Amino acid sequence: TKLIKVNTLSYKTVSANKETVEKEWFVVDAKDVVLGRLASVVAMVLRGKHKPSFTPHVDCGDNVIIINADKIKMTGKKMTDKQYIRHSGYPGGQRTQTPEDLLSKKPEAVVERAIKGMLPKSRLGSEMFRNLFVYAADTHPHEAQQPKELDLNKIK
């Protein structure tokens, strides 16, 4: 029998850590995009699940900039019928708001809330959420990072 020498490193699972993760910058135009479809793709990119080096316990996701958040679309009657509920902690302190009201006051909040709900509910999820930058206008202050255009249809 012939003995074959194999490089043992090739059989090791590579686990990413803070030092080895390479973060990229992406920009997404939210104009006329359905909110849930945008949020699910962006949440996946923020987590890093689109990378072969994805490690669940490490923030290996990329930075995402979303522009035109005020021009987001919702299907059906969600813009008027959906309710965002919050509570102050006091008796009778429950408040509701429709996406229509929220878009008129703070357009970024609708997109941020949808994406935050799709991230892990932990310290790591909070850390990932800090890599998201949402702007209502079609400009952003991150030109120095040279963000790439993110095609929502290519990443599944």
Segments predicted by a language model, with ranges:
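Hydrophobic, well-ordered secondary-structure segments
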Residues: V111-E112, K116, F129
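Ribosome large-subunit tunnel/peptidyl-transferase-proximal elements
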Residues: K2-R113, R123, P141-K156
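Short, highly charged C-terminal tails/helix-capping segments
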Residues: V134-H142
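C-terminal structural segments of small proteins and small subunits
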Residues: S122-Y135
